[in-house]
């Protein structure tokens, strides 16, 4: 089955024991990393059907559409799958900040050698 996933032209996601795949989300225009989330089969189907990014919330155990409360949705441009189909790359057009903190990206802090965190000026809150 693994060889088939590597060479097939069919979408056959390999879900983990919790029924999830990792989804890496980048801005389709800038290629900036926006967020990492998880998707189950329902989230993948909803995203493909609506063109809006949906994810599975592990903390709430619920399907959610990015932006359903904030208005900062993610319009799908392209969905890619990695070689063994256990991770997805979503190229999106964001309607606002991707992070719940109001920042463009969830990756706004750099981990320093001493274990401290440096806030990155190029990803200030909007």
Swiss-Prot record:
Subcellular localization, as worded in the UniProt entry: Cytoplasm
Reported cofactor(s): Mg(2+); Zn(2+)
Family annotation (Pfam families): PRA-CH
Protein role: Catalyzes the hydrolysis of the adenine ring of phosphoribosyl-AMP.
Residues noted as binding Mg(2+) in the record, renumbered to the chain: 82, 84, 86
Organism: Sphingopyxis alaskensis (strain DSM 13593 / LMG 18877 / RB2256) (Sphingomonas alaskensis)
Primary location group: cytoplasm
Protein name: Phosphoribosyl-AMP cyclohydrolase
Entry-linked SUPFAM superfamilies: HisI-like
Assigned EC number: 3.5.4.19
Annotated keywords: Amino-acid biosynthesis, Cytoplasm, Histidine biosynthesis, Hydrolase, Magnesium, Metal-binding, Zinc
Quaternary assembly: Homodimer.
InterPro entries assigned: PRA-CH, PRib_AMP_CycHydrolase_dom, PRib_AMP_CycHydrolase_sf
């Amino acid at each position: 089955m693994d060889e088939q996933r590597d060479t097939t032209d069919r979408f056959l996601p390999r879900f983990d024991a919790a029924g999830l795949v990792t989804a890496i989300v980048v801005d389709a225009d800038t290629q900036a990393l926006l967020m990492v989330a998880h998707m189950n089969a329902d989230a993948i189907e909803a995203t493909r059907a609506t063109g809006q990014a949906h994810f599975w919330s592990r903390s709430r155990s619920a399907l959610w559409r990015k932006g359903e409360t904030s208005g900062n949705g993610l319009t799908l441009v392209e969905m890619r799958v990695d070689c063994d189909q256990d991770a997805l790359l979503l190229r999106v057009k964001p309607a606002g900040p991707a992070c719940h903190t109001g920042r463009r990206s969830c990756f706004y802090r750099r981990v320093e050698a001493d274990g401290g965190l440096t806030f990155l000026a190029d990803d200030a809150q909007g």
